[in-house]
């Protein structure tokens, strides 16, 4: 298993607060930021960022989920076709392999670096909505044993999930801010994944 002590989130409180001042608060009926499993029903994800976030939340608590129909654990009314199932299986394999990588090479599914910053911020909020949804649906609760750092990270994710970002301008400073926020989310995910998931290096991470 990777040494997750390297994955302590960097101090990005000021960056998070900066983005929380931008745009309006988004409130999604399906992905309302709550860890309650009561919010586990819906028609499916609205974007690849949201889908990947939900998968990450699932894998943090159910690393033995089926690689071919893992989405059924999250979305009761989500009915992908055969081609989409292949894509979902590939996403599962790529995600769990990246989360178990010694190189910490997991990458968030976001618009390209040269896309408008507002669209990247919005995708970040969707990814965070998905992560919280996946964690809550998969069993995370107030009773789950987590470190103080992980609890703080989850609180930050809930806050970020409510960002709209429509007022963000395309400046170098804000581009640097969003890159720092992305890194914070990456490392924070490794932190909670390392605390919650039971996989070892000898476990086959794709055969389910």
Range-by-range predicted roles:
Residues 1-128, 132-208:
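Domain-length accessory/inserted modules outside core catalytic folds
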